[in-house]
Amino acid sequence: MNSGHPYLFHDEFYSFLNSIDEKVIPIINHDKQDNHNTNNNHYNRKTDYAKRNQSSSKKPNHAAATANQNWEEVRTMFKPTTIEKSNEEGIDKWMQDIRTSINKITSKKYEVQFQNIMNSLKKCMEMEGIDESQRNANIKLIANFIFNIASTNKFYAELYANLYGELTQSYSIFQEILQTFLSTYVSSVKEIHYIDPDVNYEGYCNYIKQNDVRKATALFITYLVKRKVIPVIRLLNIIVAFQDISKQYIEEENRVNEVDEITEILFLFLHEGKTIFQDCKGEWIWKFVILPNIETMSKYKKGDKKSLSTRTIFKYMDMISEIGD
């Protein structure tokens, strides 16, 4: 048979039937007739059903009407609830508006969003019906709110440092919050305690999260130094304090992870603040404390100290390259 020509298939098939024994042909013809009758019966049933359906469609469908009515009632009952945003002025609205503006800040939209933030701060300071104490409490709450956002975002650290630097020029509370934070920043590094994920996975995740926050804050501080919001000597003192903690930890057992994390922060200071430190190489604290500590750590070998990893040693070698360029 030629499968590529369906009509040839048809002719060949019936030629084949002609060659079948005559006793078989009547049986086939009989089956054809039965199929024909069956199809006619099926067609008649469909026709009768269509007529009945057409007839019944002329009658009012009370059940369908009732169902539609019930559905409309359900739709009315479960209409989506629309929550309207409150336009009432107050600290909650100002903080919400400020968060929105901070989230929208980009290099191109900086001025517009900065002005929106300043407008919210102005409303806070000029709000009527509250005393001076409450007004100061409100602005302090908002300032802390802004600081927490700005100091914990690694990707926008430079942009947020610019924002915070400008705010310190308009409201002294921002500088006060910054100085309070810096006074406790070094001691916060002592809170780094490694957690084994096999023992406490949730605790380990929090440990990683806190380390990321510390790194973001390190960048934020460095950019504030570049903007001269924080004096260079303040950052140099922070670096020395971190180095002292590292020197203590490498002599203790099971401090490898803590030393690694502190080293990462030190590297961020030196890498992002490279231009700053180029200008202060004559400073006594840099020349006789910071630089010798870096050189000493870079020359150690694994096993020289109880809690000194190859990772940390290599990172100090990278620091040598950074400050030597």
Please state what every model-predicted region is.
Residues 1-140, 171-197, 261-325:
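Long, low-complexity, intrinsically disordered regions
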Residues 132-139, 153-157, 228, 232, ...:
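Alpha-helix N-cap/helix-initiation sites
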Residues 212-221, 239, 259-276:
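HEAT-repeat alpha-solenoid elements in large eukaryotic scaffold proteins
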Residues 248, 253-257, 278-281:
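Charged, surface-exposed interaction regions in soluble eukaryotic proteins
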Residues 147-150, 154-250:
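Amphipathic alpha-helical interface segments within eukaryotic helical scaffold
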